[in-house]
Amino acid sequence: MVGFSQDTISKKKSQDVWQQVKEHVSIGGWVDAQYMYDKAGGVQSSVMQIRRARLDFKGSLSKWVDFRLQGDFAPNPRLIDAYVKVNFCQYVQLQVGQFKIPFSIENKYSPLDLELTENAQVISALSGYKDVTGISSYSNGREIGLMLTGTLASAKVRGEKIPILKYGVGLFGGNGINVKTDNMAKDISARIEFSPFVKNMIFSASGYWGKYNILYDGASTGVDGRRYRYAAGAEYNDKKWVVRGEYVAGLTDLASLNPSPDPDGLVVEPAFTQGFYVIAGYWFDFGWGKDIPMRQKLRPVLRFDYYRYNQHDAFNVPSIYYSAGLEWWPERHVRVQLNYTLKQRYQIDQFGHTLTAMVSVKF
């Protein structure tokens, strides 16, 4: 008889456990190293940083249940995604936890899939990235809550089944990520996407209706204000061409610039924020040569980006950004981006310039 030592048995058990983990969990992530030069109004800055350092766990607990846990370690450790998704059928899936809200088209995209290094101005301001409210927990376009999603209708186009009507609707705490809800009200967000029997083409409409605790000079006022958002747009993306445009608007109650020292005299005024953008890019796919099996991809991108912080304020003029960029994947784990933006803002004759270079390493 052949005997097995206790160490051999333990090693075999460890291998079996690891094999089961690999069958149900995928581990990935990426790191973004960025350099940015900015010049505006006579002021210059030159910044190098590790912008993101993501670690991402995805997996399935069963045929019907998926999960995701994603953290970011730059510039400070924080939880990005933490949710469980139950797939009842194609018409209904239930997602619970912290995740992206169903609002706008661009908000769906991971930074690794985004055409330029920065979101459009109005997406940042109204989709929960650098929110007009000034609340830092509105971050990464995410909230804590629950959401129903599904595909309500599909059709065959040139022999391939494509979704015609998709939806997402959720109930959220309304305070952003990694924080507890501090008000009785809950926020609602919804998005619907329609493909008009054209493969790779979608039309989208979405809304967000909520309240938040208004800040003044960085401190809570104890007063709840409206935080309403609306978006409509379209996108064509056939893995070669991408063309997308969206109009986004929002109504946000803000504390006035000169409130009375008496808290009872605090002046709250609505700000009507709006903007739109149009972006286009095309992928070139080519090899390194006959002796190198790897492929590389290159995408030039152009974007027009209009934004106005407060339409009700006659002194607040539009901010218009003209961006051009190159996105290069020398191989599937490495991305290099180079972006230039001409910024026309606040005064017609005042221009700013931003040059950004970013290297992403995916694992």
Q: Locations of the language-model features?
A:
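Cleavable N-terminal export/targeting peptides
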Residues: 1-11
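Small side chains
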Residues: 3, 150, 168-170, 325, ...
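Residue-level marker of intrinsically disordered, low-complexity segments enriched
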Residues: 7, 120-121, 246
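Outer-membrane beta-barrel pore domains
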Residues: 41-42, 68, 98, 200-363
